[in-house]
Amino acid sequence: MGKEPSKVPNKVHEFRVPYRDIDVNGEMFRAAYVVRAEEAVTEFWRRRKGRDDPWFDVAKVNSTFHSPLKLGDLVHMHVGVSKIGGKTAGFTVHMTRDGEAVAETEVVWAACNPETREPIALPEELRDWLYQFLD
């Protein structure tokens, strides 16, 4: 499942499920899980200030759902690095409500040249930084 959010300092993001994200069944839209996961990865990435990192495109998004979220639920998200490849980095966002796993979303970023969008290698210094967050 992953680490408990309370045991991993500075890797937690939280939100309360708003009305705009609720479907006709009273559950959070599945697409909203992806949006929230991307927000959590963005917050995680903010830790890396002042770096000259490559441009990234989203290469893959995959979600697993365990229990539906409802209006007003308080959700904690833990972001970990799931994989570090030669040209890609994967992030897993673990979502919990009251300590119960509700979903995991993996977001894979591919490093690329910003003008040509051709794949490029992850810089070694960036790979080293990511390793400290490997799940």
Predicted features along the sequence, with ranges:
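Hot-dog-fold acyl-thioester-processing enzymes
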Residues: 2-60, 113-135
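Hydrophobic beta-strand-centered segment that forms part of the acyl-chain substrate-binding groove
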Residues: 43-89, 102-105, 110
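Core beta-strand residues in small-molecule sensory/regulatory alpha/beta domains
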Residues: 94-96
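A glycine-centered beta-loop-beta connector
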Residues: 98-100, 117
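Short, flexible active-site-adjacent loop segments at beta-strand->alpha-helix junctions, enriched
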Residues: 99, 107, 126
